UniProtKB/Swiss-Prot annotation:
Gene that this polypeptide is encoded by: kex1
Top-level class of the enzyme under EC nomenclature: hydrolase
Protein source organism: Emericella nidulans (strain FGSC A4 / ATCC 38163 / CBS 112.46 / NRRL 194 / M139)
Compartment annotation: Golgi apparatus, trans-Golgi network membrane
Name the UniProt record assigns to this protein: Pheromone-processing carboxypeptidase kex1
Gene3D superfamilies in UniProt: alpha/beta hydrolase
Annotated Gene Ontology cellular component terms: membrane; trans-Golgi network
Length: 631
């Protein structure tokens, strides 16, 4: 879910009981479980309800970010299924504040969606096709994250600093991803989080450069914000503008006049009080929703105006009915390495976090966008056109008013604006886009507050193009995506796993990689064999000379520490290799194994993942005695 509304019923934010006996036993029997420091400790070996076939490579668990207040952030990471032209990592954050990024993982851009409360199926538009995905529950207290209840965060700079701590520690565990191109994505109130985190990353990189530190600088490439709460000064008035535009309220009507009065109060408060969350401004939305209640006691869904329900959208989307029980399942909790210190069950949105996070000092994140754009960071703002609470009218207005890189809004030159380009996807009107000076805006037709939930394939096509994914060397069935009727460069959406052409090309790619590894190790073996043959030949020659009565210098028996001795000892087990008399199987026993991966995961392993995979077999007897605790 995205932006929280005061209309949310209390049951949505209650904290349910979370297996207290199991939690206590975990702490007593396995006290180091919450202090995991290696990738193996986070490895997800199995996932209940996953589709048949090889499990996608994933890690999950907690990273400590605030030792003083027991603050831990929960993450769920998926390795990309295919590598295109470069390695990328997308960090996904949901909004709220206080709403879990498991929404994004299980209802929007993650590789799985729920068929029911215990069965997963593949998401055809998952963003993990060509990018690693890192979902993080933040700030502390959100979703599976936890902290002492009196230590929830209040300001955006606090949140950003804590997130930098998380990334520092996360990359220490998973260093193979630290050099990736990094994109930060999210929706709704994450429109406040994301620019602040981006600025904090830039400040960190600058500090490393100035101090000539050996720490790696993070390659921040772009930001993606969907239906974002970025500029309250434009978004609050857009409640009424959008309602007029969509025919929800008639201009000049009694209701229209009532809302105009509330809006004028809102604007006066924006000039004097906090700039991000203003109670008097939220009254405009609440009044509008109250007046849409019909005879069936149903009102407009504030996240999708095409729908009506009794809670005005607070129980939407419908997948929530399955997500919550799934994430409360004991086996899922174990599989995701949930710390026993997380004493309450998963809630989509935590009201305590949301109540605490009401910034009084922080400036709205829109203030940071010009500097980020001018520094070379590409930014994509996308909006589903059926969302009310963070509607596209407000987003378009903030773009029109924003000044950066010598222009205002989408100006390409003084008084000339970049044109809007029509976008069609698979023969259907998909929306339009505009671009100027590192900023891209996309309006998605027939999409809600959570556009990837409604349109997974279109949004995947959108994100691939924003990240400049090049699939020329990958293959697969290209998606039919066009701008102003002209086909775009080829990318593939949902065709990769089921594409015969792609599978054949991927298998060939793996074979070539294996052959390269084999050839390198084979060269080393060949050198050893040649040396062995030469020495062996020399010994035979000397033996024959001695046998024929020739005198010479006596050759001592090779010692165990000599090179010849080691070679002899290593091959005294019957696997003798002789020049001109060997087969490839014998060579395979000598060289390091090459790449042996399924075609759904081509990338680097974490250092100790193999150890984790072997651990259950090595410790089978001991694990039974420890009640099969998660390692």
């Amino acid at each position: 879910m995205g932006l929280l509304s005061f209309r949310q019923p209390s049951w949505r934010i209650s904290r349910s009981q979370f297996y207290p006996i199991w939690a206590l036993s975990q702490l007593l029997l396995n006290p180091i479980a919450v202090l995991a420091q290696s990738a193996a400790d986070y490895y997800v070996e199995s996932l209940p309800g996953a589709p048949e076939g090889p499990l996608l490579k994933m890690h999950a668990g907690h990273i400590e970010v605030d030792p003083e207040h027991n603050g831990h952030l929960f993450f769920w990471h998926y390795q990309n299924r295919h590598i295109a032209n470069r390695q990328r990592t997308i960090i996904w954050l949901n909004g709220g504040p206080g709403c879990s990024s498991m929404d994004g993982a299980l209802m929007e851009i993650g590789p799985y969606r729920l068929k029911d409360n215990e069965t997963l199926e593949y998401n055809e538009g998952s963003w993990d096709e060509f990018a690693n995905l890192l979902f993080v529950d933040q700030p502390v207290g959100t979703g599976f994250s936890f902290a002492n209840t009196n230590s929830y965060l209040h300001e955006l700079d606090e949140m950003a600093a804590q997130f930098i701590t998380f990334l520092e520690k996360w990359f220490a565990v998973f260093p193979e991803y630290e050099r990736d191109d990094i994109y930060i994505a999210g929706e709704s109130y994450a429109g406040q989080y994301i620019p602040y985190i981006a600025k904090a990353i830039q400040d960190r990189n600058k500090d490393i450069h100035e101090k000539q530190s050996s720490s790696a600088r993070w390659n921040l490439r772009g930001l993606l914000i969907g239906n974002g709460w970025i500029s309250p000064a434009e978004q609050y008035p857009a409640y009424l503008s959008f309602a007029y535009e969509e025919g929800l309220v008639e201009e000049g009507s009694k209701l229209g006049k009532e809302l105009e009065t509330l809006l004028s109060i809102c604007k006066s408060k924006m000039e004097t009080g906090p700039k991000i969350s203003i109670t008097d401004c939220e009254a405009v939305l609440n009044k509008l929703l109250d007046k849409t209640v019909d005879s069936n006691n149903q009102c407009i869904n504030m996240y999708d105006i095409r729908l009506r329900d009794g809670s005005c959208g607070t129980t939407w989307p419908p997948d929530l009915v399955d997500v919550k029980p799934y994430l409360h399942t004991y086996e899922v909790i174990q599989a995701l390495n949930i710390s026993p210190e997380k004493e309450s069950g998963w809630d989509e949105c935590d009201g305590n976090v949301g109540a605490a996070f009401r910034p009084q000092k922080s400036e709205p994140s829109v203030k940071l966008l010009p500097g980020l754009l001018e520094s070379g960071i590409e930014i994509l703002l996308f909006s589903g056109d059926k969302d009310l609470i963070c509607n596209h009218v407000g987003t378009e207005q903030l773009i029109s008013n924003m000044k950066w890189a010598g222009g205002t809004g989408f100006e390409t030159s003084p008084g000339v604006w970049a044109p809007r380009h029509d976008w069609t996807f698979e023969d259907e009107p998909a929306g339009y886009y505009q671009y100027a000076r590192n900023l891209t805006y996309v309006l998605l037709y027939n999409a809600s507050h959570m556009a990837p939930f409604d349109l997974p394939r279109r949004t995947r096509d959108m994100v691939d193009r924003f990240m400049h994914v090049d699939i020329a060397s990958i293959g697969g069935a290209p998606a039919d995506s066009r701008i102003d009727g002209e086909p775009l460069p080829q990318t593939s959406v949902g065709g990769q796993p089921n594409s015969t052409v792609h599978q054949e090309e991927e298998q060939q790619k793996i074979k070539e990689t294996e052959w390269n590894a084999y050839a390198k190790s084979g060269e080393a073996v060949l050198v050893v064999v040649i040396i062995g043959v030469l020495v062996w030949g020399f010994l035979i020659w000397r033996s024959r000379r001695r046998h024929n009565g020739y005198s010479g210098i006596a050759i001592k028996s090779p010692s165990r520490t000599s090179i010849m001795g080691r070679f002899h000892n290593n091959h005294s087990n019957g696997a003798d290799v002789e020049a001109g008399d060997f087969d490839e199987a014998e060579l395979d026993d000598l060289h390091s194994p090459g790449l042996d991966r399924e075609n759904y995961a081509v990338g680097e392993d974490s250092d100790d993942e193999a150890h984790r995979q072997d651990l259950p077999r090595a410790q089978e007897s001991s694990s039974k005695s420890e009640n099969n605790l998660v390692t």
